[in-house]
C-alpha cells in the first residue's frame, strides 16, 4: 500500500534510523542530558502553584468518580515524570505506536496475533477501530470516510446497548441496526454487516450476554467489538475479552489506570489495530486526524499500565471502603440519615455508598448536592441514579478528603433538621 501522507519516505526512514541509534543511547530518548536535568520553575502563569486559581476556576473534591467532565482521574507522579521525558525529544509517531503496542501486548500477555494501539481515549478507539474494519489498508477508502460507497455499512447493536458513545460508530458513516433478540440478530446479518458492537457496561440489560455475543459473531465471521471503557477494575478485564475472542476492545487510559486523560487503549487483532492506526493521527486526510495522541500520552500510557498491573488491588479496594466507612459513621450520627453500600457488577466496579434521609431532614438530594458544590472546598457528589438520596464513591478521593466530606455533609444535614 502506498500512502500519500507517507510520501516523504527518505525523511521517514531517516527518522527510524535516529530512533534506532537513540535506543543504543537511551538517555537521548527517555533520559536527561546534562544540560536539561533541572526541572523548569514556572514564572508568570503557574508561578502561584495553582494555575486553576489564577484563571478563576474552582478545583473540586471528586466524590463522583472518573468522570471526563471532572477531568477523569489524577495522573500518577511516575506517569508525569515519563511524560516529561517524552516531551524532550522528537520521534517517529508510527514507529513509537508500533513499539508501544508490542509492549502493551507483552504486558497483558495477549493471545497470539493480538496487538494494541494507544489512542486519544476509548471513544477514539471505538471510532478508529470501526474505521479500520471498514477500510482495511485501502488508502482511497480511508480518505473517503464517512462516505461508505463500496464498503460494508452496517453495525449490529442491541437496543439496550445504545448510549451516547455510539455517536463514534455513527461518525464513520455506518448505520446502526438495532436488535433485541437472537432471532432478530440472525435476521439482521447481511452482506452489509461490517461489525457487531457490544457495550460492556450494558451486559445485564441485554438478552445476549458478553460471551454469547462474541460466539454469534464468530459463527457469522463478523468482527466483534467490545466497548469496555470504564471496566477496570477488575484488572483482568484488560485481557479477559481478548481471550474470549473479541476482535477489538476499547479501554480508557485516564480512569482507574490513572494514565493521561487524553489516552486510551485499543486492543485486538494485529491487522485491525494496524488499520485503525492508518485511519488516525498522525496520518492526514483521515477520519481520526483530529483525535491526535501525542508522544507524551503514548509513553505515559505505558507507564500507567505498568503501575496498574503491579498494584495491590485488594488493598486499594479496602482503602476505598475505609473512606466510605468514615463518611458513613459521621453522617449517620444525624437523626434520620442512613447509608448503604453497593458495588456495580461492571463499569466502575468499586465500592459505592448511597446516603439517604427521611423527613427529619428538610432538604432534597438536589439541594444537598448543590450546597456541597458551593461549599469551600467544593465537593462534587452524584445523584442517586433515579433512586433516593445521594450516591458517591471514594476511589478518586485524595488523602484527607474523606474527612472533609464527612464534616461538610454532616454539617449541612444537621443544620437542616425539621
PLM regions and their residue ranges:
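Conserved C-terminal alpha-helix-loop-beta "cap" of PLP-dependent enzymes
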Residues: 51, 331-412
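Generic N-terminal amphipathic, Lys/Arg-enriched alpha-helix
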Residues: 59-69, 80-87, 352
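Flexible, glycine/charged-enriched surface loops at secondary-structure junctions
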Residues: 93-98, 113-116, 288-291, 311-320, ...
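Structural signature of PLP-dependent enzymes
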Residues: 305-329
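N-terminal export signals
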Residues: 2-5, 9-33
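Conserved PLP-enzyme active-site core in the AAT-like
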Residues: 13-20, 37-61, 65-70, 74, ...
Amino acid at each position: 500500500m502506498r500512502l500519500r501522507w507517507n510520501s516523504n519516505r527518505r525523511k521517514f526512514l531517516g527518522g527510524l534510523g535516529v530512533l534506532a541509534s537513540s535506543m543504543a543511547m537511551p538517555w537521548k530518548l527517555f533520559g536527561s542530558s546534562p544540560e536539561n536535568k533541572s526541572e523548569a520553575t514556572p514564572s508568570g502563569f503557574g508561578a502561584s502553584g495553582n494555575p486553576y486559581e489564577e484563571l478563576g476556576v474552582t478545583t473540586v473534591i471528586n466524590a463522583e468518580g472518573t468522570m471526563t467532565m471532572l477531568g477523569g482521574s489524577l495522573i500518577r507522579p511516575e506517569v508525569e515524570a515519563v511524560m516529561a521525558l517524552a516531551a524532550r525529544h522528537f520521534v517517529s509517531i508510527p514507529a513509537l505506536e508500533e513499539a508501544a503496542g508490542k509492549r502493551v501486548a507483552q504486558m497483558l500477555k495477549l493471545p497470539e496475533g493480538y496487538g494494541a494501539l494507544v489512542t486519544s481515549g476509548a471513544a477514539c478507539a471505538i471510532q478508529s477501530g470501526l474505521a479500520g474494519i471498514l477500510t482495511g489498508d485501502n488508502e482511497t477508502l480511508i480518505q473517503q470516510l464517512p462516505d461508505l460507497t463500496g464498503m460494508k455499512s452496517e453495525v449490529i447493536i442491541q437496543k439496550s446497548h445504545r448510549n451516547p458513545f455510539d455517536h463514534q460508530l455513527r461518525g464513520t458513516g455506518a448505520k446502526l441496526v438495532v436488535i433485541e433478540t437472537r432471532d432478530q440478530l440472525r435476521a439482521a446479518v447481511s452482506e452489509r454487516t461490517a461489525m457487531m458492537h457490544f457495550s460492556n457496561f450494558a451486559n445485564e440489560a441485554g438478552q445476549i450476554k458478553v460471551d454469547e455475543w462474541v460466539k454469534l459473531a464468530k459463527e457469522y465471521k463478523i468482527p466483534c467489538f467490545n466497548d469496555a471503557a470504564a471496566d477496570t477494575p477488575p484488572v483482568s478485564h484488560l485481557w479477559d475479552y481478548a481471550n474470549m475472542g473479541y476482535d477489538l476492545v476499547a479501554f480508557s487510559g485516564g480512569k482507574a489506570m490513572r494514565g493521561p486523560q487524553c489516552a486510551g487503549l485499543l486492543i485486538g487483532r494485529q491487522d485491525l489495530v494496524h488499520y485503525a492506526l492508518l485511519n488516525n493521527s498522525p496520518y492526514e486526510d483521515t477520519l481520526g486526524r483530529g483525535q491526535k495522541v501525542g508522544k507524551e500520552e503514548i509513553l505515559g500510557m505505558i507507564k500507567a499500565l505498568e503501575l496498574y498491573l503491579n498494584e495491590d488491588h485488594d488493598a486499594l479496594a479496602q482503602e476505598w471502603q475505609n473512606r466510605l466507612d468514615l463518611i458513613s459513621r459521621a453522617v449517620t450520627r444525624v437523626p434520620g440519615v442512613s447509608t448503604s453500600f453497593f458495588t456495580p457488577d461492571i463499569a466502575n466496579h468499586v465500592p459505592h455508598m448511597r446516603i439517604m434521609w427521611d423527613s427529619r431532614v428538610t432538604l432534597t438530594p438536589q439541594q444537598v448536592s448543590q450546597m456541597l458544590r458551593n461549599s469551600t472546598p467544593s465537593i462534587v457528589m452524584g445523584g442517586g441514579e433515579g433512586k433516593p438520596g445521594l450516591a458517591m464513591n471514594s476511589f478518586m478521593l485524595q488523602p484527607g478528603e474523606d474527612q472533609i466530606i464527612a464534616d461538610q455533609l454532616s454539617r449541612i444535614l444537621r443544620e437542616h433538621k425539621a
